[in-house]
């Protein structure tokens, strides 16, 4: 959703995803806001999965990339919030807007 926003196709992407994969779209809308303050934990999870793949002679690259994405979220204002005291990024749209601005500046 962040890339779609940065590329100016956010509405078209949301409409297509909602039309073709409504369950995934609704899951993403709920999951995105909840994930941000916990991004630091997901970095470690992805690195552990990457190691497991590598240990079993499978490519770990995807999981390193996902970990890097979580690192970006962790560095943003959303990653610094405390779950119980959240003030920003309470909707998927807010998360998308905030992270798109953050990525554009860095």
Which positions does each model-derived feature cover?
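Helical "substrate-binding/catalytic lid" subdomain
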Residues: 1-87
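Short, basic/aromatic-enriched C-terminal tail that caps enzymatic domains
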Residues: 85-106
């Amino acid at each position: 959703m962040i890339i779609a926003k940065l590329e100016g196709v956010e509405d078209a992407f949301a409409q297509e995803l909602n039309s073709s994969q409504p369950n995934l779209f609704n899951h993403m809308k709920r999951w995105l806001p909840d994930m941000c303050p916990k991004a630091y934990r997901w970095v470690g999870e992805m690195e552990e999965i990457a190691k497991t793949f590598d240990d079993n002679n499978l490519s770990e690259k995807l999981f390193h990339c996902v970990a890097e994405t979580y690192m970006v979220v962790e560095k943003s204002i959303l990653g610094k919030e405390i779950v119980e005291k959240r003030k920003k990024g309470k909707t998927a749209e807010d998360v998308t807007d905030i992270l798109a601005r953050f990525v554009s500046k860095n």
